[in-house]
């Protein structure tokens, strides 16, 4: 009986509008829901952890549904010129899609370790639709790579103006990017006045805020300015997706930033 249930599980989930697949980091589910104001959204869940969310309506598909992505976009949009951006971790490709559609002066490289996740993004999170409508790939404004983002960064020959760390396996960040070595390598591969942005998943106060403290300490040794934007400013002990910012430039801080250094 158990074997039969397991065999029927994909069919049962599909009946409920849930698409199931196997990816590098476990069982991956894609399904539709609504956000707090009733707007239809599509969610990506990998091995029991939500990894990405996208609006479903056609006029919102390239907009940003997550607060931390909006904070990152605010920083990037505040930079002059034609910033070179490295996004480590594709997931649903929310930020790359936004940059391709709305910040057309950026040139963005995205490195996703799992080709299966990129396929999910292309087919279910409107990535192919974005590439077709914006022409970003044809114009060299959005370049997709499958591989180890940490290795890609270390091998990069030219500096980036922005490095975004949005790479996760479940709830844990991928690679040594919270360590002293990670902070040093990031600094070495950023250009003058470059900015490092990261999604740090934890609380901002209390015993569950250790990850944020470690990242702030490591990057505070390498950069003049360190701050973060909490997802839950009124509930600091609640784990959330917090936007971490490190730079040595007099950059514009994102709205509601908490200055560490």
What kind of feature is each model-predicted range?
Residues 34-37, 115, 149-151, 233-235, ...:
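Residue-level detector of flexible, active-site-proximal loop/helix-junction positions
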Residues 210-261:
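Class I S-adenosyl-L-methionine
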């Amino acid at each position: 009986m158990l074997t039969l249930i397991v065999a029927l599980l994909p069919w049962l989930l599909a009946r409920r509008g849930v698409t199931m697949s196997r990816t590098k980091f476990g069982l991956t589910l894609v399904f539709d829901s609504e956000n707090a104001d009733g707007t239809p959204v599509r969610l990506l869940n990998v091995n029991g952890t939500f990894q990405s969310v996208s609006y479903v309506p056609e006029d919102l598909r390239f907009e940003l549904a997550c607060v931390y992505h909006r904070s990152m976009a605010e920083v990037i949009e505040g930079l002059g010129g034609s910033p070179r951006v490295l996004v480590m971790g594709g997931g649903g490709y929310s930020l790359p899609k936004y940059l391709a559609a709305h910040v057309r002066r950026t040139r963005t490289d995205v490195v996703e370790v799992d080709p299966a996740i990129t396929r999910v993004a292309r087919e279910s999170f409107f990535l192919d639709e974005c590439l077709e409508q914006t022409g970003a790939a044809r114009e060299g404004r959005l370049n997709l790579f499958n591989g180890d983002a940490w290795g890609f960064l270390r091998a990069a020959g030219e500096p980036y103006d922005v490095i975004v760390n949005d790479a996760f396996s479940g709830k844990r960040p991928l690679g040594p990017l919270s360590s002293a070595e990670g902070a040093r390598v990031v600094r070495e591969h950023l250009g003058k006045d470059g900015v490092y942005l990261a999604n740090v998943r934890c609380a901002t106060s209390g015993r569950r805020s250790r990850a944020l403290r470690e990242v702030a300490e490591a990057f505070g040794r390498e950069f003049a300015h360190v701050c973060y934007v909490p997802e839950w400013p009124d509930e600091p002990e609640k784990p959330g997706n917090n936007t971490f910012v490190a730079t040595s430039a007099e950059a514009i801080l994102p709205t509601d930033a908490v200055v560490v250094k």
